A protein has these predicted regions:
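Structured mid-to-C-terminal alpha-helical surface segments
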Residues: 1-168
Length: 168
């Protein structure tokens, strides 16, 4: 099982951030130390590819939507933590694992955890899948999975007609 990064494992170092709380109950601020977003999301990508749960897909999608993530730095951090574990994931393995996720629901382990005003239905999940594939999976070094094309074609015929259209 994957473990969270520690400060000594960090590739990019620990960075200070200002944290502000301003609401009806409390107002205050503090300095906190944390990893850079690319490092945190690099471990999210690792988790997405190492476990069956898809909640990391939601998190990666949100990170790509809300933050100006440097995808190359994120992939470097992904590789760094895999190397620390001694458990590499090649691009071919990543593509295979991602496509296998489409054999089950992308949303069932996520939706119960979300606030009512956050929408993550099948259409949004499939768009998130495509974005993570195009912006992250396609950047993992190495050759792609040799069966990816035929698996994508089969999935398109089985209900995902726009799956990875225009993907690298």
């Amino acid at each position: 099982m994957s473990q969270s990064p520690t400060a000594s494992d960090s590739l990019l170092g620990i960075k200070p951030y200002r944290f502000v709380v301003d609401n009806d109950w409390y107002r205050g601020e503090a300095g906190i130390a944390s990893f850079e977003p690319e490092e945190l999301f690099g471990t999210k990508l690792r988790a997405l590819l190492q476990r069956r749960k898809n909640r990391d897909l939601f998190d990666l999608h949100q990170g790509l939507e809300q933050l100006a993530l440097d995808a190359d730095k994120l992939i470097a951090c992904f590789g760094h933590y895999l190397a620390l574990e001694g458990n590499p994931i090649t691009r071919a393995m990543a593509e295979q694992r991602m496509l296998e996720k489409l054999g089950r629901s992308l949303t069932e382990d996520v939706v119960p955890l979300l606030p009512a005003d956050i929408r993550f239905d099948d259409a949004v999940a499939l768009a998130a899948f495509g974005r993570v594939w195009k912006e992250l999976i396609a950047r993992i070094p190495g050759e792609g999975w040799k069966l990816a094309g035929s698996v994508v074609d089969a999935l398109r015929q089985r209900g995902y007609p726009d799956l990875l259209k225009g993907a690298a």
